[in-house]
Structure formats: structure tokens, C-alpha cells
Amino acid sequence: MAGAARDRAFLDHFGGAGADRPCHVEGALMNDMSRQATRLDAIGGRYDPWLLGAAVTLASLGVVMVASSSIELEASPFYYLTRHLLFLGGGIALAFWAMRTELKTIEQHNQMLLLACFVLLVVVFVPGLGSTVNGAKRWINLGVSRFQVVESVKVFYIIWLASYLVRFRDEVNATWQAMLKPVFVVGLLVGLLLLQPDFGSSMLLLSVTACMLVLGGAPIGRIILPILLLLPALVALVIFEPYRMRRVTSFMDPWVDQLGSGYQLSNALMAIGRGQWTGVGLGASVQKLNYLPESHTDFIFSVIAEELGFVGVCGVIGLYALLVGRAFWLGMRCVEMKRHFSGYIAFGIGLWIAMQSFVSIGVNLGILPTKGLTLPLISSGGSSVLMTCLAMGVLLRVSYEADRAERLRSKLSPQGAAISPGEPAEPVVDAVPPAYAPARKPQRDTAAAPAPAAAPVAAHVAPASAILRGTSRMQPRVEPTFGRIA
């Protein structure tokens, strides 16, 4: 209504609408709106500096700790460091690509990304393509290296689920059928993961799905019921699989079988204990000298604790808290701006990083059973490094587009005043100087002929709400339950 009132005032300024408006005035109007559209297109955004700083600091710390923890594992002291740097370079390239790609383009391919999840999880079982390590079929053999497919699945699935919640957020809030569709999809993905087997990543995907459904509008009560139904099956998977049961028993008391099932955890705890307050010094770890298995991947946190001490551990946890906190803040900001796809992606990536880092640190501290989950951005591992960097690039793109929309909102609002997030701005047409306004014709005192209907002005110009909402649907929709949670 406000936009229509401004348009009518603008037309009155030019001497009426339709036949009463001269051609040169209409041309001036079109030229002015064209210039305004050009100015709006030139508006850019900026990437979140806190998010970027936390990611770069964690990745830099990862380079140092991979070099320190793997120096005695191969004949060449920098074998794993060189590989890590190569994969990190590839990850940075993927991150730059994601930072330069519009989110609407990514959303348009959400179905293809979901299909890629299933294809990747099936390919590992194809003879000649899949690679088996320690009895697990989790990798694709690329010749020069192996690629762990679940790392791609995490990113692709979060993007698909974010798109689904945008397209069906009313239905997810109101019906069982819409809520159970992503549950069915993640159930199929988890089934394929358990065949590899990969119990840790399965639980991670289930947890991220449950949290994103709640944030997307599903009632918490409806989420709890499927969880209660799945819980006995998950417990049975642990009890009836001997190696999983050994992990649980060794986690409860690793010192009972210190040289057997509790070997990894007991050495990890000894490394953490040696670190004390300030650590033994960078590069001076003893446990990494072929005592602690996987010291450069799953148990790199123990080496950090030994070399940098309690102070270094607090710094690492603080960096993860900053990264995840900024992701959640960004998600909340996007949802308030009606940019739901961007917001759900930010929430999903933040949940993934938070849960995986918590599990990895918890395993090293002995508060959780051993899982094969790396420490994001720090641990060595080509697949993890590549896909985590890609996720960071997508997250930074979310921050860029949110900032750009905020600047656009300021430009469109009168006198630069901010418009509330719940009221999308309408385009404001700059007034043409009065020198161009022709004199009005005197009106006759006749009540016969009604005024001609006003011709539509610049119908091809998209409303600002379409730009500010990003890739969300344009029609009014019920807001998700996240507003009630917040």
C-alpha cells in the first residue's frame, strides 16, 4: 500500500496518468527507474569478518598441528603436511568458488545434490571403485588418493534439507506427511551409512535433521516420537555388533584393557594429562611418537592438549564457539529478514560443525565412545578438509548476501531509515526535478466522464521484497516455530 501511494504521488507530480501524461515525462520516468535499478545492482555486501577470522585461524592451527603430530609417522617428516597443504589449497579454491556463487543458483540444484548423496553412498560398494580400509567401505579410490564420500553427503544433504524447509515450511508445521519426508530420506542415507559401516556419521546426520526440522517449524512433540521409535534399534546396533560394544566398554574404563581395546583412549588421556596448564611446548609431544594411534586425525586434539596445555585447549574451544555462534547469529538474522534458505543453511552448517567438534573433543577427553570423526578444519584428511572448506565458503556467501540485502534495504527506505524485518521494503522512485513537470490542464466542471484508469508504471521492475527475501517463496506464508523458540 505504501509503495502504491508513492507511485500515485509521483504520477500526480507529473500531471496525472494515462493520456494526461506527456511522452517525454514517461520517458524520463523510465530512464530514472533504469538508473535506480543500475545503482541497486551495484550494491555489494561484505563477508562476516569474525566468521572468516575464526575459520582461517582454525585452518592455520591445523597446518601447524598436522606438521607436529605426523613428523614421526613416515620416512619423510613432512609427508602428511605436504598432503594436508595440497588438500587445503583445493579446499580454499572450493571455498572461493562457493563465495562467488549465488545461493539461488545453489538452491536450483538441490534435487541433484540429494541424488549425488545416494550415488556417492552406493558407489563405495561397487568393486573397483570402492576402497576398503580396516573392514569399512567408506572411500572411493581415485588412484592418487581416496575420497570419503560421507563428507560430501553432509554438505549436500544440509543444502537439500534447507531448500525443502523453505518450500514446505507451512506443511512441515501442520502435517505429519511433510515432516516425515525428510525423515524418510535421512533414514535411507543412514541405512547406507550403516552398511559401510559408519555409526558416528549416521548419528550426526540424524541429529542435524532433528534440529533443523525443529528450527524449520516442526513441533518438538512430532520430532520426539520418531526418535523414541528409532532408539531401540540404535541400541540394538551397538549391543549386537562386537566392535561397537568393545568401544563402549573401553570408554567406560580404558585402564582395564590398556594394551587392548583401551589403548587409544588411555594414550590420549596420558597426552592430555602431560599438557597441564601451558603444555610441554610445540613439537615436544611424546605420545605422538608412535604411541598414540591416529595422532594427526581423530586424536589430534590430544596432541594439542599435550603441546599447548589447558590454555591452548581453551583457545581452540573458543574459536569453535565463535565460529558456531556467528553461524547461528547469521541464521537468526536471515530468518528475521525472510531469507529462509540462507538461514537454514547457516543453522545446518553451524549444527554440523558444533556436533562434530563436540564429539571429536569428547572422544579425546574420554566422555564419549570412540568415533571416527575428525576435528573440523584442524585434523588431517583430504575429504574432510575439502568439504569443510566448501561449507565455510557457502556460509561466507550467506553472510555476504545477508549484508547486501541489509544495504539494499537501507537504500530503498526513505532517508536511509531502517525498515523492520517483518515489513519488506518497496522500491522508492527518486523524484525528478520540478523543472521537468508540465503545467496542469484546467479541469472542466463536468461530472460525466470518469477519469481514465492509471496505466501501470514500470511493471517489469521486480518488487524489492523479492530481492530482500532471496530465494524464499514470495507469497505470504506462516513463519516457522523458530520465532517462538527465539
Curated annotation (Swiss-Prot):
The keyword Hydrolase does not apply. It catalyses: [GlcNAc-(1->4)-Mur2Ac(oyl-L-Ala-gamma-D-Glu-L-Lys-D-Ala-D-Ala)](n)-di-trans,octa-cis-undecaprenyl diphosphate + beta-D-GlcNAc-(1->4)-Mur2Ac(oyl-L-Ala-gamma-D-Glu-L-Lys-D-Ala-D-Ala)-di-trans,octa-cis-undecaprenyl diphosphate = [GlcNAc-(1->4)-Mur2Ac(oyl-L-Ala-gamma-D-Glu-L-Lys-D-Ala-D-Ala)](n+1)-di-trans,octa-cis-undecaprenyl diphosphate + di-trans,octa-cis-undecaprenyl diphosphate + H(+). It comes from the Bacteria. Pathway: Cell wall biogenesis; peptidoglycan biosynthesis. Its main location: membrane. GO terms for cellular component: cell division site; plasma membrane. Residues 1-50, 99-112, 163-174, 221-222, 320-342, 396-486 are cytoplasmic. The chain crosses the membrane at residues 51-71, 78-98, 113-133, 142-162, 175-195, 200-220, 223-243, 299-319, 343-363, 375-395. It is a multi-pass membrane protein. InterPro entries: FtsW (IPR013437), FtsW/RodA (IPR001182). GO terms for biological process: cell wall organization; FtsZ-dependent cytokinesis; peptidoglycan biosynthetic process; regulation of cell shape. Signal peptide: none annotated. Residues 72-77, 134-141, 196-199, 244-298, 364-374 are periplasmic. It is found in: Cell inner membrane. Keywords: Cell cycle, Cell division, Cell inner membrane, Cell membrane, Cell shape, Cell wall biogenesis/degradation, Glycosyltransferase, Membrane, Peptidoglycan synthesis, Transferase, Transmembrane, Transmembrane helix. Its EC number is 2.4.99.28. GO terms for molecular function: lipid-linked peptidoglycan transporter activity; peptidoglycan glycosyltransferase activity. The keyword Cell cycle applies. Pfam families: FTSW_RODA_SPOVE (PF01098). Belongs to the SEDS family. FtsW subfamily. Peptidoglycan polymerase that is essential for cell division. HAMAP family: PGT_FtsW_proteobact. This is Probable peptidoglycan glycosyltransferase FtsW. It comes from Xanthomonas oryzae pv. oryzae (strain KACC10331 / KXO85).
